[in-house]
């Protein structure tokens, strides 16, 4: 009886939080719509794309492997049922509507900095020469502060005009962010069911600079690659008519004494994720109301951990926290980093769940959403260290964290990302990282830290009131904090510009297995835009519809927060299309088929109202990942025998 009451309490609270989120987001979207729809004010020449498929493209699309999840009751897909192509759509007549710029004034929370005239995001074009190479100069350039650029009022007028009219613009491609993805199409290997490791002959043991691997060719006019723009015609049926089995978060199950996996599984949550002691009582991030995935995998015989890192911080800070979560010790964000961005150098102290984690004792990382970016940056620091921290220590002396020294390869066996915005998301570009949303979110996080209600992991920004500090002094110190317009935040790292900086900094490790899982929960309309599927988690509908209407057609299919093209792989890194039976590949992104009907929350079961995906379907999805990781261990043990 007590357990049932606990279950209902958690579900009601979850629904209430979701409803509140929708109302707040909707109000912000209506009031600050001019700010939320950031587009270039200058007219750009767009390259028309052929929407119709050629017969060759059609054949290629149908040969793409399909995701297969091991379910208790297998469902068969009728391959004979092809999607009926829509007739050519006549272009809607263009209507000119004059809209005055929004006259709304942004109200700043009481604890916010007095005036924010310069937003943290910038409308700055990254030179192609910079994108084409990751030289030492470009690395140093990204270390420096970049001055914000003011957006003109004409931007707002154009954005509001776009919202008020039904004008259909020709499909276009953003040359800054999409041309590399067009030129870097997936390779489709033959799937023969073998598990032998296939290492690219071009891959060498020593890591080579990324500028030797990037195609520097200029973008050229191409037909839209069907596999990258819209959901494929054939998908494994992921929906289920069964209602989800609601389960309360039980007591933690201990790891097995003799686990099946030699290398532990480490799950890393994304933005606004709460795990462990910082989670609300009864909250279960990995599995939601459907299953406790950690306990489920431990009962199945796997050594499994759920990392707990900051919910709002930047990938740098989250990567550092992930390191100390595993190794133990007091978090050191770095002397150079903390001085540059204006926050405290040291954070919380972790006990350490894998204190013996070192070269030769690797782990498997599985990251959802922003967690995938965090993992990639941590792996980079393990191998190469942080050049800025090394230079600072050489100049000023003092202590430097072992993480920033580098030289720690062979600590990661595999990296698996789920719905990760490797190339950023328009949801952060045009909504999340706008001044209004930043101020509301950080003010709430600051108040929660002050009251001790919710730990957003931002105490290094001084959100916690000091002993003996008056309330007046505390409010003044918070108002003068650099957090309000800083780029050292999760919201900035999730923008396309912030993600591009991470992509330029990191590179593939030839000794690691990489894999990505992607969902799409939108469908194309007669006007060529994408709207949310029926049943999408309702807090994602607003952003899902917004992303589905952006100018760049390649970015429209999405899972409610992340575009399909962003989740598949970093834009400038090697990739290959695979399915569950494909042979294993090191040093390249193994891209699984897009999972139709899966939104951003479905992958972690965090939609209490979802009836499309059952608990068994969710657990089977993670069992398929576990099977893949065990195949890797078997292949590695055979190779080393």
UniProtKB/Swiss-Prot annotation:
Keywords: Calcium, Hydrolase, Lipid degradation, Lipid metabolism, Metal-binding, Secreted, Signal
Reactions it catalyzes: a triacylglycerol + H2O = a diacylglycerol + a fatty acid + H(+); a 1,2-diacyl-sn-glycero-3-phosphocholine + H2O = a 2-acyl-sn-glycero-3-phosphocholine + a fatty acid + H(+)
GO MF term list: calcium ion binding; phospholipase A1 activity; phospholipase activity; triacylglycerol lipase activity
Main location per the UniProt record: secreted
Documented EC number(s): 3.1.1.3, 3.1.1.32
Catalytic-site annotation from UniProt: 369 (nucleophile), 559 (charge relay system), 600 (charge relay system)
Binding-site list for Ca(2+): 535, 599, 602, 607, 610
UniProt keyword Transmembrane helix, yes or no: no
Biased composition (Basic and acidic residues): 73-94, 140-165
Keyword match Transferase: no
GO cellular component: extracellular region
Signal peptide (from-to): 1-38
Compositional bias segments (type: Low complexity): 53-64
Residue stretches of biased makeup (Polar residues): 95-106, 127-139, 227-239
Region (Disordered): 41-174, 206-246
This protein's name: Lipase
Organism from which the protein derives: Staphylococcus hyicus
